[in-house]
From Swiss-Prot:
Keywords: Cell membrane, Membrane, Transmembrane, Transmembrane helix. The lineage of its organism: Bacteria, Pseudomonadati, Spirochaetota, Spirochaetia, Spirochaetales. It is found in: Cell membrane. It is a multi-pass membrane protein. This is Uncharacterized protein BB_0073. The chain crosses the membrane at residues 5-25, 39-59, 62-82, 122-142. GO terms for cellular component: plasma membrane. Its main location: membrane.
Protein backbone atom coordinates (compact mmCIF):
# COMPACT_ATOMS: atom_id res chain seq x y z
CA UNK A 1 0.00 0.00 0.00
CA UNK A 2 1.37 3.39 -0.93
CA UNK A 3 0.92 6.81 0.67
CA UNK A 4 -1.32 7.60 -2.31
CA UNK A 5 -3.75 4.84 -1.28
CA UNK A 6 -3.70 5.98 2.35
CA UNK A 7 -4.59 9.52 1.21
CA UNK A 8 -7.41 8.10 -0.96
CA UNK A 9 -8.81 6.14 2.00
CA UNK A 10 -8.82 9.22 4.23
CA UNK A 11 -10.48 11.36 1.53
CA UNK A 12 -13.06 8.61 0.88
CA UNK A 13 -13.91 8.35 4.55
CA UNK A 14 -14.34 12.12 4.84
CA UNK A 15 -16.51 12.19 1.72
CA UNK A 16 -18.66 9.27 2.85
CA UNK A 17 -19.13 10.75 6.31
CA UNK A 18 -20.16 14.07 4.76
CA UNK A 19 -23.08 12.23 3.14
CA UNK A 20 -23.97 10.00 6.09
CA UNK A 21 -27.47 11.09 7.00
CA UNK A 22 -28.46 11.91 10.55
CA UNK A 23 -31.09 9.19 10.07
CA UNK A 24 -28.27 6.61 9.90
CA UNK A 25 -27.21 7.53 13.41
CA UNK A 26 -30.81 7.22 14.63
CA UNK A 27 -31.08 3.68 13.20
CA UNK A 28 -30.80 1.33 16.16
CA UNK A 29 -30.95 -1.90 14.18
CA UNK A 30 -27.56 -3.07 12.85
CA UNK A 31 -29.22 -5.32 10.24
CA UNK A 32 -30.87 -2.27 8.64
CA UNK A 33 -27.50 -0.48 8.61
CA UNK A 34 -25.80 -3.48 6.98
CA UNK A 35 -28.53 -3.69 4.28
CA UNK A 36 -28.26 0.03 3.58
CA UNK A 37 -24.48 0.02 3.28
CA UNK A 38 -24.49 -3.23 1.27
CA UNK A 39 -26.73 -1.44 -1.28
CA UNK A 40 -24.47 1.63 -1.20
CA UNK A 41 -21.30 -0.47 -1.64
CA UNK A 42 -22.71 -2.57 -4.50
CA UNK A 43 -23.98 0.56 -6.27
CA UNK A 44 -20.61 2.28 -5.84
CA UNK A 45 -18.80 -0.76 -7.26
CA UNK A 46 -21.08 -0.75 -10.32
CA UNK A 47 -20.58 2.98 -10.85
CA UNK A 48 -16.82 2.54 -10.35
CA UNK A 49 -16.66 -0.31 -12.88
CA UNK A 50 -18.39 1.82 -15.51
CA UNK A 51 -16.47 5.00 -14.70
CA UNK A 52 -13.00 3.40 -14.58
CA UNK A 53 -12.68 2.80 -18.32
CA UNK A 54 -14.16 6.21 -19.15
CA UNK A 55 -11.64 7.85 -16.78
CA UNK A 56 -8.74 5.94 -18.39
CA UNK A 57 -9.99 7.06 -21.82
CA UNK A 58 -9.98 10.70 -20.64
CA UNK A 59 -6.47 10.25 -19.18
CA UNK A 60 -5.15 8.62 -22.37
CA UNK A 61 -6.42 11.49 -24.54
CA UNK A 62 -5.35 14.25 -22.07
CA UNK A 63 -8.97 15.25 -21.46
CA UNK A 64 -8.95 15.02 -17.65
CA UNK A 65 -10.15 18.63 -17.46
CA UNK A 66 -13.56 17.27 -18.60
CA UNK A 67 -13.84 14.97 -15.57
CA UNK A 68 -15.26 17.64 -13.17
CA UNK A 69 -17.90 18.57 -15.79
CA UNK A 70 -18.79 14.90 -16.25
CA UNK A 71 -18.84 14.47 -12.45
CA UNK A 72 -21.27 17.39 -11.88
CA UNK A 73 -23.59 16.24 -14.69
CA UNK A 74 -23.60 12.71 -13.28
CA UNK A 75 -24.39 13.98 -9.76
CA UNK A 76 -27.37 16.02 -11.01
CA UNK A 77 -28.68 13.20 -13.21
CA UNK A 78 -28.47 10.75 -10.30
CA UNK A 79 -30.18 13.13 -7.87
CA UNK A 80 -32.99 13.77 -10.39
CA UNK A 81 -33.31 10.03 -11.03
CA UNK A 82 -33.58 9.26 -7.31
CA UNK A 83 -36.10 12.11 -6.86
CA UNK A 84 -38.25 10.69 -9.68
CA UNK A 85 -38.04 7.17 -8.18
CA UNK A 86 -38.92 8.58 -4.77
CA UNK A 87 -41.96 10.40 -6.22
CA UNK A 88 -43.08 7.17 -7.93
CA UNK A 89 -42.85 5.30 -4.62
CA UNK A 90 -44.96 8.01 -2.96
CA UNK A 91 -47.61 7.82 -5.72
CA UNK A 92 -47.93 4.03 -5.63
CA UNK A 93 -47.26 3.29 -1.94
CA UNK A 94 -48.62 6.51 -0.37
CA UNK A 95 -45.30 6.75 1.46
CA UNK A 96 -41.65 6.92 0.53
CA UNK A 97 -39.39 3.96 1.21
CA UNK A 98 -36.29 6.08 0.65
CA UNK A 99 -35.34 9.21 2.53
CA UNK A 100 -33.52 12.24 1.17
CA UNK A 101 -30.50 11.07 3.14
CA UNK A 102 -30.56 7.79 1.24
CA UNK A 103 -30.69 9.63 -2.08
CA UNK A 104 -27.85 11.94 -1.03
CA UNK A 105 -25.73 8.98 0.02
CA UNK A 106 -26.25 7.34 -3.34
CA UNK A 107 -25.35 10.50 -5.25
CA UNK A 108 -22.21 10.78 -3.11
CA UNK A 109 -21.09 7.44 -4.52
CA UNK A 110 -20.05 9.32 -7.62
CA UNK A 111 -17.77 11.47 -5.47
CA UNK A 112 -16.02 8.54 -3.81
CA UNK A 113 -15.62 6.69 -7.10
CA UNK A 114 -13.76 9.67 -8.55
CA UNK A 115 -11.37 9.62 -5.60
CA UNK A 116 -10.82 5.91 -6.25
CA UNK A 117 -10.22 6.62 -9.95
CA UNK A 118 -6.69 7.87 -9.41
CA UNK A 119 -4.62 7.37 -12.58
CA UNK A 120 -1.81 5.72 -10.57
CA UNK A 121 -4.14 2.99 -9.33
CA UNK A 122 -5.14 -0.17 -11.11
CA UNK A 123 -8.74 -1.32 -11.33
CA UNK A 124 -8.51 -3.68 -8.35
CA UNK A 125 -6.71 -1.12 -6.16
CA UNK A 126 -9.64 1.23 -6.72
CA UNK A 127 -12.09 -1.53 -5.78
CA UNK A 128 -10.06 -2.14 -2.64
CA UNK A 129 -10.26 1.56 -1.71
CA UNK A 130 -14.04 1.62 -2.15
CA UNK A 131 -14.65 -1.58 -0.18
CA UNK A 132 -12.30 -0.57 2.67
CA UNK A 133 -13.95 2.85 2.97
CA UNK A 134 -17.50 1.48 2.95
CA UNK A 135 -16.57 -1.20 5.52
CA UNK A 136 -14.88 1.39 7.71
CA UNK A 137 -18.00 3.59 7.73
CA UNK A 138 -20.28 0.59 8.39
CA UNK A 139 -18.16 -0.60 11.33
CA UNK A 140 -18.07 2.96 12.68
CA UNK A 141 -21.87 3.36 12.42
CA UNK A 142 -22.44 0.00 14.11
CA UNK A 143 -20.05 1.05 16.90
CA UNK A 144 -21.88 4.39 17.25
CA UNK A 145 -25.29 2.67 17.47
CA UNK A 146 -24.02 0.34 20.20
CA UNK A 147 -22.43 3.28 22.08
CA UNK A 148 -25.68 5.25 21.70
CA UNK A 149 -27.71 2.33 23.12
CA UNK A 150 -25.50 2.38 26.21
CA UNK A 151 -25.87 6.15 26.58
CA UNK A 152 -29.65 5.94 26.05
CA UNK A 153 -29.88 3.62 29.07
CA UNK A 154 -28.43 6.38 31.24
CA UNK A 155 -30.41 9.59 30.49
CA UNK A 156 -28.07 11.70 32.67
CA UNK A 157 -25.23 11.38 30.13
CA UNK A 158 -25.81 13.59 27.06
CA UNK A 159 -22.38 13.37 25.38
CA UNK A 160 -23.75 12.24 22.01
CA UNK A 161 -26.53 14.83 21.67
CA UNK A 162 -24.44 17.05 19.38
CA UNK A 163 -24.43 16.14 15.65
CA UNK A 164 -20.83 17.35 14.93
CA UNK A 165 -19.54 15.18 17.79
CA UNK A 166 -21.28 12.17 16.20
CA UNK A 167 -19.59 12.79 12.85
CA UNK A 168 -16.18 13.36 14.46
CA UNK A 169 -16.50 10.06 16.37
CA UNK A 170 -17.65 8.28 13.18
CA UNK A 171 -14.62 9.64 11.29
CA UNK A 172 -12.17 8.47 13.96
CA UNK A 173 -13.85 5.06 14.27
CA UNK A 174 -14.04 4.60 10.48
CA UNK A 175 -10.30 5.19 10.11
CA UNK A 176 -9.40 2.51 12.66
CA UNK A 177 -10.37 -0.57 10.52
CA UNK A 178 -8.68 0.95 7.46
CA UNK A 179 -5.47 1.69 9.39
CA UNK A 180 -5.40 -1.86 10.82
CA UNK A 181 -5.78 -3.33 7.30
CA UNK A 182 -3.08 -1.00 5.92
CA UNK A 183 -0.63 -1.95 8.71
CA UNK A 184 -1.42 -5.65 8.22
CA UNK A 185 -0.80 -5.40 4.44
CA UNK A 186 2.57 -3.69 4.94
Amino acid sequence: MTNNLIACLIINNLTLIHFVGFEDIKIKNNIMLIKRYAIITITSLLIYSISFYLYKLFAKNNLLFLVPIFYVILIYVLILLFKVLNDLFIVYNKKSNYSNDFMLSNSSLIAITFFALDKNNGFFEGLEILILSALGILIALMSITSIKKNFDKNPKINILENEPIYFFIIFILSLIPNIIILIYNQ
